[in-house]
Amino acid sequence: MLFSFQRALSCLVLGGALLLSLPTQAFCFNEAGARYKVDPLLLRSMATVESSLNPQAIGKNRDKKGRITSRDFGLMQINDRHIPELRALGILSNEQDLLNNPCLNVQIGAWILAKHLKQCGVNWQCLGSYNAGFADNNGPRRMIYARKVYAMYMKLKGGAV
């Protein structure tokens, strides 16, 4: 009986923490969108596809032999290849900053996306480069990612989520 009460209390506390974080998350997406001139709902859609809105998410990218080639961090799954530049700019000290500060993570994701859109234009292939990169042979992967983001965008826009 005590165990189930503790479990129920834990669920309520966790649920409350998640509810409290939703307005904060909305603020982060709105702020980043305004700063980098990107639709905040698009950023939220990308974060949902990238991490299921989990600020502690860590993704491991592997080669064909299963070796880890890079890691992605936080809501926007910022790839570790960006860390040296972000350190040099004084934006973060290490990858833990990407996990501990979700708003910073969203700002960095919006910055990366804005750089991509400036480089290759405002189109779905270019949006897909956020996840799949610019390599010529990654065109199909870019479009798969873009379709996922578009589907999530339409779902969020319709209020279904």
Q: What residues fall within each predicted segment?
A:
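Catalytic glycan-binding domains that act on GlcNAc-containing polysaccharides
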Residues: 27-161
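N-terminal signal peptide c-region/cleavage motif recognized by signal peptidases
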Residues: 21-23
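Bacterial N-terminal signal peptides that target proteins for export
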Residues: 1-12
